[in-house]
C-alpha cells in the first residue's frame, strides 16, 4: 500500500526523523491558513499524488508570499499531473502539502529496500540526491553505497557511520546522519514497510540533516496489524479495478496491453504474461483468481477484465489442482453469458477433471477457443487480437 508524502512524514516524525514543518491543504483557503501558521519567509507548495517526478512535471512550487501560495494552490488543485510514473492519463491533484522552505546546502539519497537476492533489508545511499536513483545506478553506479542488514541485530551504528562518511556527509553532522538512518530503519521495521525512500535527504544551512521528501510503501499482507497505516489509504489514488478485485479476494494489477489474463496462481500468472510477450502480444493485467475460485468469482473476474477498454481478447489459463477444471469451465460459461462476451476468448485447462471441463466448454455453444497447452493458448490469443 502506498501513502502520500505528508503522511509518510507524519510517521517519520514520530520516530525522530527530522522533517520540515508542514500542513496538508485541500482548498486554496486552507493552503493560505497553513502558510500563516508556518510563519516562514519561503513556502513550498507540493502536489500530493502517489507518484514520483512531481517536481519535473510542475507539481512543486516555491512561494515567497501568502498570495503566491494561494495562487499556486488554485493552479494545482483539480489539475491532472502527468509524470513518468503516472502514465499518460496522469493523476488529479486533490490535496497539497504546504511546507516551510529550507536553506539547502547539499542533497543526498537514503533508502531502505527489500533485496530479494539476499532476502535482507538493504540500506542504500548516495551523494547524488534529488535525482532518480535509477539514473544514478545506470550512469554512476559507483556513487551508490549499499549495506546489507542482518535481521537478527538490525542496522548498527557503525554501519550507518560508514555510509555517512562514504557519501561525504560533513564530519560534524555524521552523528545526526547516523540517528537519521537508524530512526528510518526502526520505522521501516515496526511499520512493515517494503520501501522507505528519502530523496532528497538534505543538509541545511543551519546544520540540520532533514528529509525533504519521503516515500513509504507498506506490505499489504501486514496491514491487519497496522491499523493506523490502513487509515492513511487513499482510494482516489488506486485503480478502481484493483479496488473492485480486492472485494472478491482477487489479485489484480492493471497493465498497458490488450490481452486480458485470468489465471490461478501467481507463478503461473507471471509465466502466462511472459509467454504472451514471447508470441508478440501484450498482457492487459495480472489476475490471480486463487486456489478456491467459484463461478461467482470467475464471473466477477471477467467483469473486471472487461472494464478495461483496452482489452481486445481474453486468455484463461488454469491448472486444476485444488481448483477443479469443471468448476472453472462452468464459471467461464456462466460469465461469458452474463457479460455478453463478444471478444475472442481462449481457454487452456489442465489438471483435475480436465476432460469434464473441456466438455462443458465445447457443449456450451459459445465462441470459446480451446488450447492444448499454455504456448498454444498464448499463440492463439495473440493471433486472434491482431
Curated annotation (Swiss-Prot):
ATP binds at residues 46, 53-55, 99, 102, 107. Succinyl-CoA synthetase functions in the citric acid cycle (TCA), coupling the hydrolysis of succinyl-CoA to the synthesis of either ATP or GTP and thus represents the only step of substrate-level phosphorylation in the TCA. The beta subunit provides nucleotide specificity of the enzyme and binds the substrate succinate, while the binding sites for coenzyme A and phosphate are found in the alpha subunit. Its cofactor is Mg(2+). It holds the Pfam family ATP-grasp_2. GO terms for molecular function: ATP binding; magnesium ion binding; succinate-CoA ligase (ADP-forming) activity; succinate-CoA ligase (GDP-forming) activity. It is an enzyme of class 6 (ligase). The keyword S-adenosyl-L-methionine does not apply. It comes from Bacillus pumilus (strain SAFR-032). The lineage of its organism: Bacteria, Bacillati, Bacillota, Bacilli, Bacillales. It catalyses: succinate + ATP + CoA = succinyl-CoA + ADP + phosphate; GTP + succinate + CoA = succinyl-CoA + GDP + phosphate. It comes from the Bacteria. Substrate binds at residues 264, 321-323. Heterotetramer of two alpha and two beta subunits. Pathway: Carbohydrate metabolism; tricarboxylic acid cycle; succinate from succinyl-CoA (ligase route): step 1/1. This is Succinate--CoA ligase [ADP-forming] subunit beta. PANTHER family: SUCCINATE--COA LIGASE [GDP-FORMING] SUBUNIT BETA, MITOCHONDRIAL, SUCCINYL-COA SYNTHETASE BETA CHAIN. One of its GO terms (biological process) is succinyl-CoA metabolic process. InterPro entries: ATP-grasp, ATP-grasp_succ-CoA_synth-type, ATP_grasp_subdomain_1, Succ-CoA_synthase_bsu_CS, SUCC_ACL_C, Succ_CoA_ligase-like_bsu, Succinyl-CoA_synth-like. GO terms for cellular component: cytosol; succinate-CoA ligase complex.
Amino acid at each position: 500500500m502506498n501513502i502520500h508524502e505528508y503522511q509518510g512524514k507524519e510517521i517519520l516524525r514520530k520516530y525522530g526523523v527530522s522533517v520540515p514543518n508542514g500542513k496538508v491543504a485541500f482548498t486554496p483557503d486552507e493552503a493560505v491558513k497553513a502558510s500563516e501558521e508556518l510563519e516562514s519567509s519561503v513556502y513550498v507548495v507540493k502536489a500530493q499524488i502517489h507518484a514520483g517526478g512531481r517536481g519535473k512535471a510542475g507539481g512543486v512550487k516555491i512561494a515567497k508570499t501568502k498570495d503566491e501560495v494561494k495562487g499556486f494552490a488554485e493552479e494545482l488543485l483539480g489539475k491532472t499531473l502527468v509524470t513518468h510514473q503516472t502514465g499518460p492519463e496522469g493523476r488529479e491533484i486533490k490535496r497539497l502539502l504546504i511546507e516551510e522552505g529550507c536553506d539547502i546546502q547539499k542533497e543526498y539519497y537514503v533508502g531502505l529496500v527489500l533485496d530479494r537476492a539476499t532476502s535482507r533489508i538493504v540500506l542504500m545511499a548516495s551523494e547524488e540526491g534529488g535525482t532518480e536513483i535509477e539514473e544514478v545506478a545506470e550512469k554512476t553506479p559507483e556513487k551508490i553505497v549499499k549495506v546489507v542488514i542482518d535481521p537478527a541485530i538490525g542496522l548498527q551504528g557503525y554501519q550507518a557511520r560508514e555510509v555517512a562518511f562514504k557519501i561525504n556527509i560533513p564530519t560534524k553532522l555524521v552523528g545526526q546522519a547516523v540517528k537519521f538512518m537508524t530512526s528510518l530503519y526502526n520505522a521501516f521495521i515496526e511499520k512493515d514497510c517494503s520501501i522507505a525512500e528519502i530523496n532528497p535527504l538534505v543538509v541545511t544551512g543551519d546544520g540540520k540533516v532533514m528529509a525533504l521528501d519521503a516515500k513509504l510503501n507498506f506490505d499489504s499482507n501486514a496491514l491487519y496489524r497496522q491499523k493506523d497505516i490502513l487509515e492513511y489509504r487513499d482510494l482516489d489514488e488506486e485503480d478502481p479495478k484493483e479496488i473492485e478485485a480486492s472485494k472478491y479476494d482477487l489479485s489484480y494489477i492493471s497493465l498497458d496491453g490488450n490481452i486480458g489474463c485470468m489465471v490461478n496462481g501467481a507463478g503461473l500468472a507471471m509465466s502466462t504474461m511472459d509467454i504472451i510477450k514471447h508470441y508478440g502480444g501484450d498482457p492487459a493485467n495480472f489476475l490471480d483468481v486463487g486456489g478456491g475460485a467459484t463461478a461467482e468469482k470467475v464471473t466477477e473476474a471477467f467483469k473486471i477484465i472487461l472494464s478495461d477498454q483496452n482489452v481486445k481478447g481474453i486468455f484463461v489459463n488454469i491448472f486444476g489442482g485444488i481448483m477443479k477444471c469443471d468448476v472453472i469451465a462452468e464459471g467461464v460459461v456462466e460469465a461469458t453469458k452474463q457479460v455478453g462476451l463478444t471478444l475472442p476468448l481462449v481457454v487452456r485447462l489442465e489438471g483435475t477433471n480436465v476432460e469434464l471441463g473441456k466438455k462443458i466448454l465445447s457443449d456450451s455453444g459459445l465462441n470459446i477457443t480451446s488450447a492444448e497447452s499454455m504456448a498454444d493458448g498464448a499463440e492463439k490469443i495473440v493471433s486472434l487480437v491482431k
